[in-house]
């Protein structure tokens, strides 16, 4: 089946009120004619109100967020709930990013609980998976990815991936300027889809698998020619409207 590509910008810990308004204005101008690719941005949660207001009146760019907690309300200082994100119109929610796994010690079981919370709230989980450089060099890429996916399947069943997104991010390629070759990335994406297909071909056929390892305006087009790369989770290049637009349009063209 034809999967509609998704390109999502992860702003990480960047921006301000003014930056949010300015970047979204640039994105709206650059992406006004895009029809064949879904687009989302995940600003810092502090700026969701500015982003929601700036995105009003258009339907090309959806709003997302970079994290969520498993609790809906209560005495959980500093946390953000699914209901709060929905209140701002956020749809695509990143979980399991390597920076959360590394700096905040989030484990597969906890991330699976976040996945469940998002599904229960009717939001779209963007589950990040991927291996470190050491794991890559030790030939453990597939085992690591399978383990991270299986945490969700074991808790919720393979059907949980209906309408969900997986972002394969080789950790050694994030923010380093290194990137897997298109063939390397495709091989892992094909493995991920095959791993899910072993439980359900129908679920595997529809799940969006993004690539998230230093995607930029120079390497995007070649990555998107690969059959199992359904878009990108973009970091640094998402902070510049022209560069992000090139990536979106490359996905739209490749998957037309």
Curated annotation (Swiss-Prot):
It is found in: Cytoplasm. GO terms for biological process: gluconeogenesis; glyceraldehyde-3-phosphate biosynthetic process; glycerol catabolic process; glycolytic process. InterPro entries: Aldolase_TIM (IPR013785), TIM_sf (IPR035990), TrioseP_Isoase_bac/euk (IPR022896), Triosephosphate_isomerase (IPR000652), Triosephosphate_isomerase_AS (IPR020861). It is an enzyme of class 5 (isomerase). The active site is at residues 97, 169. The keyword Metal-binding does not apply. It catalyses: D-glyceraldehyde 3-phosphate = dihydroxyacetone phosphate. Keywords: Cytoplasm, Gluconeogenesis, Glycolysis, Isomerase. Its EC number is 5.3.1.1. The keyword Cytoplasm applies. Pathway: Carbohydrate biosynthesis; gluconeogenesis; Carbohydrate degradation; glycolysis; D-glyceraldehyde 3-phosphate from glycerone phosphate: step 1/1. Substrate binds at residues 10-12, 175, 214, 235-236. Its main location: cytoplasm. One of its GO terms (cellular component) is cytosol. GO terms for molecular function: triose-phosphate isomerase activity. Pfam families: TIM. Involved in the gluconeogenesis. Catalyzes stereospecifically the conversion of dihydroxyacetone phosphate (DHAP) to D-glyceraldehyde-3-phosphate (G3P). Homodimer. Belongs to the triosephosphate isomerase family. This is Triosephosphate isomerase. It comes from Actinobacillus pleuropneumoniae serotype 5b (strain L20).
């Amino acid at each position: 089946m034809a999967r509609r590509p998704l390109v999502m910008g992860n702003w990480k810990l960047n921006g301000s009120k003014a930056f949010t308004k300015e970047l979204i204005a640039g994105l709206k101008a650059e992406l006004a004619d895009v029809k064949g690719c879904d687009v989302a941005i995940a600003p810092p949660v502090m700026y969701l109100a500015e982003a929601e207001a700036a995105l009003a009146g258009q339907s090309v760019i959806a709003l997302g967020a970079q994290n969520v907690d498993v609790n809906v309300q209560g005495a959980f200082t500093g946390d953000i709930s699914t209901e709060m994100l929905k209140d701002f119109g956020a749809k695509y929610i990143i979980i399991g990013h390597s920076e959360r796994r590394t700096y905040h010690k989030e484990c597969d079981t906890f991330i699976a609980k976040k996945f469940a919370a998002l599904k229960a709230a009717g939001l779209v989980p963007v589950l990040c998976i991927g291996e470190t450089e050491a794991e890559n060099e030790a030939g453990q890429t597939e085992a690591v990815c399978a383990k991270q996916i299986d945490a969700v399947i074991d808790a919720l069943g393979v059907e949980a991936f209906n309408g969900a997104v997986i972002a394969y991010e080789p950790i050694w390629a994030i923010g380093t300027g290194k990137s897997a070759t298109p063939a390397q990335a495709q091989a892992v994406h094909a493995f991920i889809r095959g791993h899910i297909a072993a439980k359900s071909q129908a679920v595997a056929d529809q799940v969006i698998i993004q690539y998230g390892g230093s995607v930029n305006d120079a390497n995007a087009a070649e990555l998107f020619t690969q059959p199992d790369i359904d878009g990108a989770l973009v970091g640094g290049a998402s902070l510049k409207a022209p560069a992000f637009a090139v990536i979106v349009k490359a996905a739209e063209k490749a998957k037309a």
